[in-house]
A protein has these predicted regions:
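Structural core segment of the AMP-binding/adenylate-forming
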Residues: 24, 30-33, 106, 134-222, ...
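AMP-dependent adenylate-forming
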Residues: 39-45, 64-88, 210-211
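Conserved AMP-binding/adenylate-forming core of the ANL superfamily
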Residues: 57, 74-129, 146-151, 216-225, ...
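Conserved pre-ATP/AMP-binding loop-to-beta segment of ANL
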Residues: 73-76, 196-200, 204-211, 215-249, ...
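Conserved AMP-binding A3 loop
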Residues: 86-90, 236-269
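AMP-binding/adenylate-forming catalytic core of the ANL superfamily
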Residues: 145-155, 162-166, 336, 431, ...
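Gly/Ser/Thr-rich phosphate-binding loop
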Residues: 221-222, 330-338, 347-411, 424
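Conserved AMP-binding/adenylation subdomain of ANL enzymes
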Residues: 268-285, 295-335, 349
């Protein structure tokens, strides 16, 4: 399951109408009382229910988008720095509608799957809202996919159309497509019949060039007629918020990715809740250096900005620390998103102190566990005093837990908050019983954001969402008497050494306090005597010289003997996904192989 730890510091407490209004202190006070009433604080069991009095919006994304445009058509909607593009909401709407009608002209129907395989660019943004307007289900495809992964993604959800970039970071997308489907060289672009991609009827290449068997993006937006405009309006009138609108492939550690299927209602409400958490208004500008294909950027970035009529600022097609801060300063951004490694890279820029980041105040940190020290630096050195802390996963659209501004600083940086509005959260043991307060167990959630299913995979859906509607995260957490949750690791990452349960996060947090350590990853490896032993991979800071024995001496006074790492390795980098998620299973495999080789040498 694709898990994100997203960092917030204000909970969603607003009164929603059909379209959401602004939050205020009065509604916050009411919500605080409601939380106390429905949960009977202090808690004795690890179950917490978010406020229920907040109505959910039942608008479709297209309907809501048009409402925002009508409200403030001349407001800045999107800036794509590397493409030199600046669009107002009225201009953005015009281009979205043109693409939507172009897709209709290609023959795309409501409910069909349209894949987008591209880094961040204006075409990605347009595709997101154009597909929503015609009721097509946008399928987000990882820009790092290789041919076999692309083939699996397209075929598993039966995509009828693929919108693709030409290349990205050394990957030639057009060449890969031709390797998968050599028929493209000779077939008619309007009548595709590809053996390896049997459901694919249209390939649209971003730009003005059309390779054999493909349409160009520019040609598609010039296809519509007056009839397609009438068709667009007719379709919009019959869409509803309960319909599927997005498929996100979860980055599982074993087997093929699963297609988490999300509705208009799922992701629009999640975006609105988080926008309120950030106190977002139409005056805000959010810098989004994270990849749009991921739920983090698509929902908490692009859609979040539209939910409030704010400006979405994209600094580049991929992350670069210097470019990101250049754009934050140049545009006067008020918010910045990123994974922990991005913020670390920004803080470590040699000219970091030369930047004027005074306009920043908030943002979301997500993708992997963030060291407490980094959080504090982001709050103080980057002026992001309202940096947000929350928790969820793709299957939750993606947020289910969120913290509050009036919490202690300690809670803001060490917990992932309490259940979001219209969400229940519980911690359970191996038998499914709710744990007592303070006892670790699996984090489960239930509510408005829970995905409908894994696309065309009933067995995996049932394995993840039980008969009562509870989503089982696979994460280990602990709840306190006020309902605040702390994530202590993954169930699969928990180490059992000689019968003792060891939580990697605890050891990692201790290592983060050692001078010269930039990052630490703790995982278990097989051991004949104890079942498992603790292994540590440590990333030194630039120019730091670390000594294994000195690190062990440091840990000796801070950890019980059974938590001490048996094996320590200093490494330059970790195996990670594009979104910054650690792949501990790869570390484990590599370490086991290394130790096995030593044993037989």
């Amino acid at each position: 399951m694709s898990t994100i730890c997203v960092y917030f510091n204000f909970v969603v407490y607003i009164t929603h109408t059909h379209f959401h209004g602004e939050s205020n202190a009065h509604t916050h006070t009411i919500a605080v009382k409601e939380v106390e009433q429905i949960n009977h604080l202090p808690l004795s069991q690890s179950y917490f229910k978010g406020i229920q009095s907040t109505p959910l919006t039942n608008s479709t994304i297209g309907e809501y988008f048009d409402f925002i445009v009508d409200k403030n058509p001349e407001a800045l909607a999107v800036v794509v720095h590397h493409q030199g593009i600046r669009l107002t909401y009225k201009e953005f709407q015009k281009e979205v509608n043109q693409l939507a009608m172009g897709l209709l002209a290609l023959g795309v129907k409501p409910g069909e799957r349209v894949g987008i395989w591209s880094p961040n660019n204006i075409e990605w943004c347009l595709t997101q809202f154009a597909t929503a307007k015609i009721g097509a289900i946008m399928v987000c495809i990882n820009p790092a996919y290789r041919p076999n992964e692309l083939q699996y993604a397209l075929n598993s959800v039966e995509c009828s159309t693929l919108i693709t970039a030409s290349n990205f970071k050394g990957s030639d997308y057009i060449e890969m497509l031709n390797c998968l489907a050599p028929e493209l060289a000779t077939c008619d672009k309007d009548t595709l019949n590809l053996k390896a991609l049997p459901t694919l009827k249209n390939i649209v290449r971003i730009g003005d060039e059309a390779p054999p068997g493909m349409h160009s993006f520019n040609d598609v937006i010039n296809l519509p007629t007056a009839a397609h405009e009438r068709e667009l309006k007719a379709i919009g009138a019959h869409l509803n918020a309960e319909q599927d609108i997005n498929i996100q492939f979860t980055s599982g550690t074993t087997g093929n990715p699963k297609g988490a299927t999300l509705t208009h209602k799922n992701i629009l409400n999640n975006a609105l809740f988080v926008a309120e958490s950030m106190h977002f208004t139409s005056n805000d500008k959010l810098c989004i250096p994270i990849p749009l294909y991921h739920c983090f950027a698509m929902v908490l970035g692009s859609l979040l900005c539209v939910s409030k009529g704010a400006a979405a600022i994209y600094p580049g097609d991929s992350f670069d620390a210097k470019t990101t801060l250049d754009v934050v300063q140049q545009e006067g951004c008020t918010a910045l998103h990123g994974v922990p490694t991005m913020f670390i890279s920004e803080l470590e820029l040699s000219n970091f102190n030369d930047y004027d980041l005074s306009t920043l105040r908030t943002g979301v940190m997500a993708g992997s566990t963030c060291p407490e020290q980094v959080m504090r630096k982001v709050q103080t050195q980057m002026n992001m005093h309202q940096v947000l802390i929350a928790y969820g996963q793709t299957e939750c659209s993606p947020i289910n837990n969120i913290t509050e501004t009036d919490s202690s600083i300690e809670r803001q940086v060490t917990t992932v908050g309490r259940a979001l509005a219209h969400t229940e959260v519980k911690i359970i043991d191996e038998l499914g019983n709710i744990q007592q307060i303070g006892q670790p167990g699996e984090v489960c959630s239930k509510g408005a954001g829970i995905m409908r299913c894994y696309w065309n995979d009933e067995s995996k859906t049932k394995a993840t969402i039980d008969d009562s509607g509870w989503l089982h995260s696979g994460d280990l957490g602990v709840m306190d008497t006020e309902g605040f949750v702390t994530i202590v690791g993954r169930i699969k990452d928990m180490i059992i050494r000689g019968g003792e349960n060891i939580y990697p996060r605890e050891i990692e947090e201790v290592l983060y306090t050692y001078p010269g350590i930039q990052d630490a990853a703790i995982f278990g490896i097989t051991d004949e005597k104890y079942g498992e032993e603790v292994c540590a991979w440590i990333q030194p800071k630039e120019d730091a010289v670390l000594d294994e024995q000195a690190v062990r001496e440091f840990l000796k006074d801070k950890l019980a003997y059974f938590k001490m790492p048996r094996h320590i390795r200093f490494v330059e980098n970790y195996p990670m996904t594009v979104t910054g998620k650690l792949q501990k299973f790869k570390m484990r495999e590599q370490m086991q192989e290394e130790l096995s080789d030593k044993a037989f040498s």
